[in-house]
Amino acid sequence: MIYCFHYKKHYLNDIDSIICYPYKVSIGYNCFINRNVYITARSEITIGSNVLIGPGVIINSGMHHYKNPNILIRDQGHHIKPITIGNDVWLGANTMIMPGVIIGDGCVIGAGAIVTKSLPPYSVAVGVPAKIIKKRK
C-alpha cells in the first residue's frame, strides 16, 4: 500500500510499476494499479476514485516534438499537457493514455487501446486510436 501526496489510500501492485514525478500525480480513493504500469507526470495527472488500471498501462503527460527533420528528435523538446482520469474508470491491459486527454467518469478502455482524444463520461472505447463503440448509460 502506498499513499499519494494527498494521503488518500489506494493500492499499487508495485512489481515493476513506476511513477515518475510523483509530486504531480493525484490519486483518489480505492484505486488499483496493476503491475508494470508506467506513469510519467511531466504535467499534472489526476486519477479519480475507484479506478482500475490494468497491467502494462502507460499514462504519459509528455511526448517528444519531432516535426523538424534537421534537428534530432531528442533535442526538439516536449509536448506537455495534463491528463485527467475520472471516477469509476477501467483502463484495460496495455492501454496508453496520451497528453491532454480527459477521460470522463465511468469509462471503460479496452485492452491495447491508445487514447489520443478526450472521452465523454460512460464511454466504452477500443482500438488504435481509441474510438467509442458504445455507451454504458
Give names to the regions the model predicted.
Residues 1-24:
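Extended, small-residue-rich solenoid/repeat segments and analogous flexible loops
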Residues 18-27, 32-101, 128, 136-137:
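Flexible, glycine/small-residue-enriched loop-and-beta-strand segment within the central core
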Residues 52, 107-108:
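Short alpha-helix at the nucleotide-sugar/activated-sugar donor binding site of glycosyltransferases
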Residues 60-61, 110, 116-117, 133-135:
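Conserved acidic donor-binding loop of glycosyltransferase catalytic domains
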Residues 101, 112-113, 119, 128:
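Short beta-to-alpha loop/turn elements within the nucleotide-binding domains of ABC transporters
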Residues 104-107, 120-122:
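Conserved catalytic segment of ABC-fold P-loop ATPases
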Residues 119, 123-137:
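C-terminal end-helix/capping segment
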